[in-house]
Each structure stands twice: as structure tokens, then as C-alpha cells.
Amino acid sequence: MTRHLFALSLLGLSFALNPSFAAAQETLRPLAEALLDVQADAGALETRIETERFAALKSLPENTPIRMTGLNAKWRLPFVIARDELATKASVTFKWTPSPVLLPVKSQLNLRLNGELERSLPITTEEIGRTVVTTVELNPKRLKDLNELEFEFVGSYEHNCESPADASLWLEIDRESTLTLSKQKIRVANELQLLPSPFLDPGARSRLTLPVLFPVRPSDKTLQAAAVLASWAGKTADWRDLSLPVHYGEAPAEGHFVVFATPETLPEFLRGTAEITGPEVRIADAPHSDWAKVLVIAGRNDEELVEAAQALALEGDRFAGPRVLVTEPPRLPPRPAYDARKWLPTDRKVRFDELVDHPSQLRSRGTFPDPIAVHFRLAPDLFVLPRTSIPMELSYRYTPPGEDAKASVRVRINDALMGYEVLESDESATAPVVRRVAALDAMAGFLRALSLPTVHLDAANTLEFDFQYDVAVTDSSLPGKCPSASLTENQVEIDPASTLDFRGFYHYAELPNLRLFTLSGYPYSRFADLAQTTVVLPKNPEAQDVSTMLAAVGRIGSQTGTAGVLVTVSTDPSPEESVLISVGGSV
């Protein structure tokens, strides 16, 4: 057999990730009071002050201010508060510049938090045309898990005749403006239904850290259980960077962590709890902390640790209560190659609704609808060059442009323009109207057979549909007549039944190729459950060796979107092993 071998250096395992927060965001449930432990002395908890730049909270173009106009008068800033955090104070400090032609007082800037008005700032004579720095205190009682801060520009430049399309109506906000939150950690209840919270925050935009504790030096089977958990953590972390520091013997000083334990290795802080009667997952209070939790992967022996970790990786979203006993080993049928959840299938046409988390991601609305983005990944060894294009059947619906107005749709693949179509009015539409949803009966619909140029394809791809509407401004030369602009609420939608067709391509890659491994975990990710992968560690591995191994396996899980529940770990590999990952100079 051919052996594929990569050695991971302890000098550092670092991967560059491209966050795509615009991709579908899961709505986070607010913390229910029933899920919080009562704090005897909430004031004793340490308060941390965190300040985030607007540009860090929302992807913004470099060196470009946030610009609002009469036609595009609102801008929204999303931000997340973790489930185990309580915001006691919140404020926003922003630098802004209004147009010099605005009428004072009549023009204003409104701030809303989660739909509720926080502050209305009339633009004074002294502020017109000048850069102003303003701090607004926000009501912390309105904060939830998933929040949205909205800026609304209300501009006026004439007492009688004015048009929202006038170019002199604008207000700019500096992208370096900041949001400041004062937070306290709170202790959530011992409830597995909250997973992956509080151990991994689904709304975090930065690096995630999940320490792993081994009460004693781990066996190969215990390391295998840890690798399965790391793969689940990587799948959960998705595009975020993930760190899994390893501790031997001593629990981390603070923060949430995971521990692997049998009756013989049960750490002191868990003694006296429920007896271990089989593979199980439980949640408990962490030692030396007023708020942290510990996720316990337990079993009567090392083999049951693997079963418990596999159950968490495969069925953790169905866990409930403080403790779950695994009564039957998880069913692990063999999986075919290239069936990773994140990789586009190549044996059939793929519908667009398979590429998004929620149907709403295929819709957009507004005077100027935001582009609709569809993200998809390809197997890293998919050989697309022999063909010049990929068939795409695209059906879309849109609000027809008004009389004398123009509209178009631009289709881009990885920022490269691949198609342009003029959107015709309802009266002049030549294609049949699609009427699949009653609410969309007023929208014109078209079916187009397009092709994606293969030269622009990569392992990770973004297909963007940018619907652009022009506003028709009517200008009258008659006395007493004012120019007018029709600000229609336009709605656009990509039909979920639209398809991409990657059938007929071959898989080919020259190995070894560290770039493919870094980008997608290939060749190990070829089987997403890592059924043919063995990670080789030195005998008696150091904590850093194990941490590097967990980071590598977690990275593969993040790129496939699939937990590697069949990965094996060995400190004494047999020569028959066919696909190996070597850590710490072990081979």
C-alpha cells in the first residue's frame, strides 16, 4: 500500500482561516432563567471590559468608511454575547461626519438596539460638515445572545423640495469606531442540551480554546477518544481557529475544559459524584472557579472512553440533562470516499437549498437588496481543468423594476464576473413567470442555463448573485413641482431548486502536498470519518505533542464538517498502516 506521511512540527501548527460570518448565522437562544445557577454573591464575579472595532465585528473593506445616504439610510452591526456571559454595561463610541449641506436639527442620526430606539442625535449647526466623536450608553437589559445595533440616517437639505436620491445627502461613520461591553461570567446549569455551549461559543468571531485534561498519561485508546472529541470540536468551530491545549494531572487554572476519566483515573474534584457504570458524557462544575464547567468523557475502561466520545460527536445535539449514559455503541457504518458534509457531491446534481443552512439565505429584500451568497467546497483533488465550465441551472425571482427604472443581476464566482442579465419589467418579460409561492406572485421569474468557468474555481468557493436596482428620479421643470424618487421595497430570491452539476470529473493530486493538507486535511479527509487514518505519536508523548495532534484532527473536522469518529491513534504503529499522520518526530 502507498503510505502518505506528514510530520507536524512542534514549532507551531498554524492555519490561516477565512471567516465568512455573512454565511448563515444560527439564531442563538436567549438564556432561560431556569438554566442559570443562582449566584450567592454576583458582585464577587470579576468584570471584564471588552472593546471591539466595527471593522472586526463586521467584515468591512479596508480604508473605506461606512457610508449612509438618502437611498441607503440604514447600517447594521451584529454582535454576540456568549451564553455564559452577562453584559452589565454597554456603550458605543463612533466617529462620524455629516454632509456639509444638511439642515441642522431637522437632520438626525438614530441608534437602535435589537429594534428598540436607544438614542436620537439631532445634527447641530456646529456638527454639520465636521468630524464628531460621540459615545452612547446602551441599555444592557436589551442585550441577548445575538444582537444588532442599527444606525439610521435621516437627512434633509431643503425646506421645501428635496429628493432622497440627491448626492449631497450622506453621513459617514469611521470603521475604527468601537463597541465596549462590560461582562461578567455566569455559571450555567449542568445541562448537556446547551452543547456546544459553554465549551465552544457558536457565535464567537475569534479563536476558540478548549483545554483537555488527562488525569494520568493517556493510553492509545484514551488518545483516540481525545482525537474523536477534537474532530467534533473542529466541526463545531467551523471557520474559527481552534486551540486544544493539553494538561497532565493538574486541571486548568480557569475556564471550561474537558476531562477523560475512568474509575481508576477519576480526578479528585469528581470523586463522590455518580458512579461510572459505562460509557457516558456528563457536565459538572469545574474546580477553582465560580463559573466554569467541565465536560466529562467517562467509561469503565479506555474502550468505553472511545464509545462515549463517538456518541458525543454523532448524537451530542440530542443530549439533555446533566448526564447521558451510552447504552449501545454508536452505529458506525462504512462511509464512501468524498462524502464529507461540506464537500459538493460529484455523483449527482446538487440543489442550492443543500448548500445553505436556512432557506432565508437565498432571499434578500430592500430598496437595494444585499447580494445573495452561496458558499460551497470541492474535494481538494477534484480535477476540473479538462473542462472549461460547470453546468448551472439557475432560476430566480425578482420584483420587476418600475417604469423608467433599470435593474440587473450580476453573477460572480469568487469575485470574478461570470454573467450579467438585464431584469425586464413585468410587461416586457419574455420568459414565463414562476408562481410557486403565493406571496411571490407579483415577482417575475426566469430560468437560465449558465456555466461556471472552471478557471475561477478553488477548494472553497463563493457564488454571488448581486441584484442591482436603479432608482428612477422624476424631475419637473414646472414651477412648484419637486423631483421625486420611487423607493420600492424590492424582493429577490434564488430558487432553491437551482442546481450545480459537477458530475463526470476525476480525482487527481500529486502527493505529498502540504498545501492540500493545510487547506483541507487531504489526503486524510478523503474519508471524512478518518476510517483509514492513524495518527502516530511518540511513546509517552508530551502534552505539546498531544495538543498538536488534536489541533491537526480538529482542523480536518472543520474542513469536512464531519466528525472523524473512526480515527485511530498509535504510539507503536504497525507497518501495515496505510495513511499516517506523524507528530513529534515519531516516525
Question: PLM ranges: what are they?
Answer:
Residues 1-5:
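Positively charged n-region of N-terminal signal peptides that target proteins for export
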Residues 7-18:
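Bacterial N-terminal signal peptides
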Residues 25-587:
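Solvent-exposed alpha-helical segments and adjacent loops
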